[in-house]
Amino acid sequence: KLISPDGKEITSSSANLTKNIIKTWGIRENTNQKLLKLSNITKIFDDRSISYRKKLIDEKAVKAVNDVSFELFEGETLGLVGESGSGKSTIAKIITGLVRPTAGELEYNNFSLYNSKKKYQISKSRGQIQMIFQDPYSSLNPRFKVRDIIAEPLKFFQKNITKNDLDQSVFDLIDIAGMTRQSLDRYPHEFSGGQRQRISIARALATRPRLLICDEPTSALDVSIQAQILNLLKDIQDELHLTMLFISHDLPVIRQMCNRIIVLKNGIICETNEAETLFNNPKHQYTKELINLMPKIESII
């Protein structure tokens, strides 16, 4: 469990998952089989895809991701850590089809997610890959009530869902996120940042994904709220047997959440290792520098 700044253990604030949720979810046992594979992924942003301001500074193309390869196994949490501009979010967007890779191969469950023309084949994942974004307010439609935000992916991926089943699924998802059902008839601007992120989590779970990509999901939140959201994600992963790709520049959070960690710098992988091994015995100089920059609590006399 995570500890709050005052030294108290922060317990999970998620609702207990009901038998109905477990029964209808179709829980898969963790097999430790390869779920995701990136092979020599490269992304180059040329002068047509970078901002005008960037062009004034430097007209050269930007290689955001450079020959990145790694595997993600079912049931684990893999961390991507690095400073801003290291390529973490670009990798996440490539996996979810928001950005096309310039080169390389991406496989999900042994199927290629990009065809020969680098077009994303959503039919291969069908909602099994979902993403939780850094800013929950920007990722939620301000014109939709919470009920509609959560129901939208359900209606998209389950064309023949009945109204009763839709309503029950929305109730289940808001329960999982630890929110009250009364919140379903309110708009995003009526909630705090932590509550909005809970709504984002409920929406991401609507398609019953196998892989959840968390792109700095707590960096915009207060420290105590961060711990609650992290515990919520860990509880959900344990109960629903999800696989996670967790992206952050916050090393203590990465250490707490992840089984393995990949360190990125300028779009290149510097080091990959088990979490505790990486922190206790870092090999790459950049990894050592990041760890040395971690805030340390000095003894108070």
Regions found by a protein language model. Name each.
Residues I254-Q256:
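A short, surface-exposed alpha-helical micro-motif characterized by mixed small hydrophobic
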Residues G104-Y114, S125:
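Conserved ABC transporter NBD signature motif
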Residues I269-N273:
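ABC ATPase "signature
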Residues Y187-F191, Q195:
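Conserved ABC ATPase signature
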Residues N164-Q182, I291-N292:
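Conserved ABC ATPase "signature" region
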Residues T96:
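Helix-to-loop junction immediately C-terminal to a conserved catalytic motif
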